């Protein structure tokens, strides 16, 4: 089999990895092999955590809504059930924001849910 000289493409590939590893500590930003491992791991964590972030924020919104709902005398599950019955389509992100920034507006939504629960 003939020898393959990769020319500038090999350097391009290595430089791409080293550029991604910029700012890493020690050999991980200097040596190609160490940098490759570090970058692969970092990209895997980034991929995983983009999905985990969605779960974490949904849990945070639910916690905030539950706290505000209990101040208004209703549990989270009854609030959501009442809103579904009333055909109110407000997502959890908006409701959590309302609960924090506009308690009166949130109380109106709660009263709507209580009427239809």
Swiss-Prot record:
Any one annotated GO CC term: ribonucleoprotein complex
Gene Ontology annotations of biological process type: ribosomal large subunit assembly; translation
Alphabetical list of Gene3D superfamilies matching this protein: 6.10.160.10, Ribosomal protein L20 (1.10.1900.20)
Keyword set, alphabetical order: Ribonucleoprotein, Ribosomal protein, RNA-binding, rRNA-binding
PROSITE patterns linked to this entry: RIBOSOMAL_L20
Pfam families: Ribosomal_L20 (PF00453)
Molecular function via GO: rRNA binding; structural constituent of ribosome
CDD domains: Ribosomal_L20 (cd07026)
Alphabetical list of HAMAP family matching this protein: Ribosomal_bL20 (MF_00382)
The protein's role, per its UniProt record: Binds directly to 23S ribosomal RNA and is necessary for the in vitro assembly process of the 50S ribosomal subunit. It is not involved in the protein synthesizing functions of that subunit.
Family: Belongs to the bacterial ribosomal protein bL20 family.
Name this polypeptide is given: Large ribosomal subunit protein bL20
